[in-house]
């Protein structure tokens, strides 16, 4: 599974500005989804890879980013 990492309290994606390989995105993906996850910056959001199937990613149902 893949997807944008999401702030569970706000429903917002994690923003990034350095597209492609991005240490911030990689670190955040690993923190939220485990050490097997990968991450990079895609379309100014942190995109996480190698997630378990039940991983919660953006968008959250009934929670829009405010």
Curated annotation (Swiss-Prot):
InterPro entries reported in the protein's UniProt record: LCN-type_CS_alpha_beta_dom, Scorpion_toxin-like, Scorpion_toxin-like_sf, Scorpion_toxinL
**Quick check: keyword Secreted in the entry?**
yes
Q: Which cysteines are joined by disulfide bonds?
A: 12-65, 16-41, 25-46, 29-48
Q: What is its main location?
A: secreted
Q: Where in the cell is it found?
A: Secreted
Q: In which tissues is it expressed?
A: Expressed by the venom gland.
Activity regulation, short description: Is susceptible to be neutralized by human antibodies scFvs 10FG2 and HV.
All copies of the LCN-type CS-alpha/beta domain together span: 1-66
Stored SUPFAM superfamilies: Scorpion toxin-like
Task: Specify the domain of life of the species encoding this protein.
Answer: Eukaryota
The entry's cellular-component GO terms read:
extracellular region
Q: Name one GO biological process term.
A: defense response
Give UniProt keywords alphabetically.
Answer: Disulfide bond, Ion channel impairing toxin, Neurotoxin, Secreted, Toxin, Voltage-gated sodium channel impairing toxin
Recorded GO MF terms: sodium channel inhibitor activity; toxin activity
* Function per UniProt: Beta toxins bind voltage-independently at site-4 of sodium channels (Nav) and reduces peak current and shifts the voltage of activation toward more negative potentials thereby affecting sodium channel activation and promoting spontaneous and repetitive firing. This toxin is slightly toxic to mice.
Q: What is known of its domains?
A: Has the structural arrangement of an alpha-helix connected to antiparallel beta-sheets by disulfide bonds (CS-alpha/beta).
Return the similarity comment: Belongs to the long (4 C-C) scorpion toxin superfamily. Sodium channel inhibitor family. Beta subfamily.
Name of the protein in question: Beta-mammal toxin Cv1
Q: Which organism is it from?
A: Centruroides villegasi
